Amino acid sequence: MALLQIAEPGQSAAPHQHRLAVGIDLGTTNSLVAAVRSGVTATLPDENGQHSLPSIVRYTQEGIEVGYVAAMSSAQDPKNTIVSVKRFMGRSLTDIQSGEQSFPYQFEASENGLPLFVTPQGLVNPVQVSAEILRPLIERAEKTLGGELQGAVITVPAYFDDAQRQGTKDAASLLGVKVLRLLNEPTAAAIAYGLDSKQEGVIAIYDLGGGTFDISILRLNRGVFEVLATGGDSALGGDDFDHLLQAHMLQVWQLTDIDSQLSRQLLIEARRVKEALTYASDTEASLTLADGSVLKQVVTKAQFEGLIAALVKKTIASCRRTLRDAGVTADEVLETVMVGGSTRVPLVREQVEAFFGKAPLTSIDPDRVVAIGAAIQADILVGNKPESELLLLDVIPLSLGIETMGGLVEKVVSRNTTIPVARAQEFTTFKDGQTAMAFHVVQGERELVDDCRSLARFTLKGIPPLAAGAAHIRVTFQVDADGLLSVTAMEKSTGVQSSIQVKPSFGLSDSEIATMLKDSMKHAKEDIGRRMLAEQQVEAARVLESLNAALSKDGDLLTSDERQQIDTVMAELVQVAGSDDADTIKKAIEILDEHTQDFAAKRMDNSIRVAFKGQSIDKI
């Protein structure tokens, strides 16, 4: 008798229970949770019907408030109400305090220089604050779905570095939540639209959220999502629009010295004005002062657009650079996907349409599209859609490499390489008898270590004491799907190895990625020249050291005239080795090589005689 297998529409009729997994958009301003139910992907509302949760946490003597409750108290208690905590993730306290923006919070530094918020509940770090935002989302999901979650896909900005990504994972770990994967926010949006519209070709993901801007250029082809290039700004978003409006109203009302409570109140009003101007040509802003008096001012759409025009123009410039990195033109982009609440601003949509030459896609709520894409990916990763052929390829934003002799950078994984990825290269020892090797892992596009960003250092010990160049050390760079880097060095003959997982103590500064890319292009010709010089200087040092060792061991094979001739040519190389003329050094090395050919032949003959001494012809 055949057994019927019954399943919800759109779900697999597998004999096992449907596994529960969610996608979480852990946003700077708002956060959402979504899931696939009965084949339909949607964000999950709370008991009041609210889908988004303000990413705000307030600490009081009585406990911890999260979301709308905390938001209502933010103006009255700004010191203990933490907003936009995502901007603090993976950054040092020094970096935060040296920025242009001031914060009402009281900070202390942790042992490794990271920020700690001083609250009535004690010292808390950004990871713990993020966990408090995740907590109600997880509880909401388990209550709505009716069971314990098997895992979650959490989205992060494409520009998050290793420390920021690890911090996001740690926040989920504090709640006992298994992170199936960290997913770049623009890529999550591509999943949401790619599965719905079944498009093939080049697509731009324009993601302007509360705190970050990301632009990603993707190629969609037969279910494969390949990120061709990414760009953006990790400190530009709708929050900056709010701050510009706030500054404008301060100037209009001639308010020069206001406390943090009134400042927060005005910031909330600025956000309301921004949202109102999305649909109206003007709106009235108001502010109630401590003495009860009320300030009022009409703000027009034209005024608002004048304030934010430079920032919007900055996002378009990022689009232009990223298209160039991807090797495509704006005309080749089939569709532009709008992500993030700030893309509702009319000027943003107008500028994006003007640049790409077509109206952007907005059929999926730009506030929810990232969470929806994450939920689709979570449903696949947890095993509910084993038949799915979806393949996702992200890229790394900056090249990864290792320092070699002379302060040079040997790139192991190039910028915009798809991840996950593993790359390996072989290196060797520089000196005879060398038993250890120090490794310096760097990030960047320049040719010299001094111009790149240092990520980590580690040492491989236990290398057999062989002649210089005889040992073979294989160095493997592995970047997982979450963008975290592991580097392993192994000596091939013995198998001895050492490794390190790169978790920087703090992330890149706001504009460092853009600056590094611009500098690499600006100094490209100069860098190549410096690299060629350094390579010749290193080669000169290697040749001189090797020849000195050979002369110490087998110098008696030479006549006095031969030795004097070699010493003279060696002295000439020593004299030019420290110069800044690569061609002169190279020529001196070639001359020395010519004058030592006979010596090399004598050493070879002598080695053969020694090896065969006392051996019979028959035995040989």
Swiss-Prot record:
A Pfam family annotated for this UniProt entry: HSP70
Source domain of life: Bacteria
GO biological process, alphabetically ordered: chaperone cofactor-dependent protein refolding; iron-sulfur cluster assembly; protein refolding
Keyword Nucleotide-binding: yes
InterPro entries with a match to the protein in the record: ATPase_NBD, Heat_shock_70_CS, HSP70_C_sf, HSP70_peptide-bd_sf, Hsp_70_fam, ISC_FeS_clus_asmbl_HscA
A GO-annotated cellular component: cytosol
UniProt GO MF annotations: ATP binding; ATP hydrolysis activity; ATP-dependent protein folding chaperone; heat shock protein binding; protein folding chaperone; unfolded protein binding
Entry keyword set: ATP-binding, Chaperone, Nucleotide-binding
HAMAP family: HscA
Functional summary from the UniProt entry: Chaperone involved in the maturation of iron-sulfur cluster-containing proteins. Has a low intrinsic ATPase activity which is markedly stimulated by HscB.
Entry similarity comment: Belongs to the heat shock protein 70 family.
Protein name stated in the entry: Chaperone protein HscA homolog
Species in which this protein is naturally found: Shewanella oneidensis (strain ATCC 700550 / JCM 31522 / CIP 106686 / LMG 19005 / NCIMB 14063 / MR-1)
Gene symbol of the encoding locus: hscA
